[in-house]
């Protein structure tokens, strides 16, 4: 059973489908206002309806200045604080390691590691103002522990 999150507000990155979409819905159903930041700004076709309390916003977590402005604007709606950040945005690319394009490697590391850290830093000042001191939840993957030959950089980025 989920805790009562009435009056709480926070951000889920990469929530237009999959795990992020479901996390956003569960948090909203528990009473939170959930801002989902994704490249499309809307749920992917066929994933269903978002719960009441979920607000989809178009944004690129790789654009730090834009995220600073967006996060400040969202926090301002909630007395200058946020209660949670769920870093869910992530990418992968399937290719054997010996043929892996470095451009794809860089993209995976940027999105799955660097941007996760940057988003945490951007949100931290607002999270620490929360009555509950806020929470940062980073979504990882079993791939980090199992390893798969066709997604080596993804596995490394999720550890």
What are these regions (language model features)?
Residues 9, 16-17:
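Conserved glycine-rich cofactor-binding loop
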Residues 30-46:
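Conserved glycine-rich Rossmann-like NAD(P)H-binding loop of the short-chain dehydrogenase/reductase
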Residues 96-97, 101-106:
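Substrate-binding pocket helix/loop in short-chain dehydrogenase/reductase
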Residues 88-93:
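Conserved NAD(P)H cofactor-binding loop of Rossmann-fold oxidoreductase domains
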Residues 98, 146-152:
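Active-site loop immediately N-terminal to the catalytic Tyr-X3-Lys motif
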Residues 141:
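Residue(s) in the substrate-gating loop at a strand-loop-helix junction
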Residues 120, 157:
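Active-site helix of classical SDR
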């Amino acid at each position: 059973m989920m805790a009562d999150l009435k009056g709480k507000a926070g951000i889920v990155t990469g929530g237009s489908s999959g795990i992020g979409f479901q996390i956003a819905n569960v948090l909203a159903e528990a009473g939170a206002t959930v801002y989902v930041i994704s490249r499309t700004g809307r749920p992917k076709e066929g994933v269903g309806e978002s719960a009441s309390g979920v607000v989809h916003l178009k944004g690129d977590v790789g654009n730090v200045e834009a995220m600073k402005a967006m996060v400040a604007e969202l926090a301002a709606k909630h007395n200058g604080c946020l209660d949670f950040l769920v870093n869910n945005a992530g990418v992968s690319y399937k290719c054997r390691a010996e043929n892996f394009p470095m451009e794809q490697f860089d993209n995976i590391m940027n999105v799955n590691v660097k941007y996760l850290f940057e988003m945490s830093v951007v949100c931290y000042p607002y999270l620490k103002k929360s009555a509950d001191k806020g929470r940062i939840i980073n979504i990882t993957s079993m791939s980090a522990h199992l390893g798969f030959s066709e997604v080596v950089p993804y596995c490394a980025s999720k550890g």
